[in-house]
Amino acid sequence: MVRWIQSHRADAEVVPLADRHYNRQKIGSPQFAPPGRCLVLKTPEVDAFWITSWPFAGYVKHAWAGAWVCSAFRNESKHLSSELIREAVAVTLAYYGSAPEQGMVTFVDTRKTKPKRHPGYCYLKAGFQYAGQTKGGLVALQMLPRDMPAAQRAAGEWKPYKPARKSEEVLW
């Protein structure tokens, strides 16, 4: 069973957790997700959260344009991060319907995380692969569609993704 429940970009319960994430832009801001298409998940205890953003490829400057992006994940729960990551990918797949060709990527800033031999180790354990680095030096990790778990809905109330306008309906 999936441990995630669907949330939203300005969930006041998630703000304190988001404020403790290393890439937080403005501490205390009521919104913590990047602009545009996104899926926000939280655990029922609000001790972990996840954001999948899906920026339009034309606005992306990194090499993985078109991919879903895990723009934030913080786990302060007892659950294994690698398990929560796989579940979040499964929920993202259920939410959007099918994965883009580039799959999902995440970026790890090794200057702002604890020094480790394998940056993003929990993502690697979840099935992501090393995909290179950004021009800014962030480690890029990627999960291709063939490696994704089967789609699963989040627990609780479910609101499926609906494009805001026809131009959002993208064919791969």
PLM region spans:
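Non-catalytic substrate-recognition and accessory regions of acyl/acetyltransferase enzymes
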Residues: M1-R86, A90-F107, K112-K116, Y121-W172
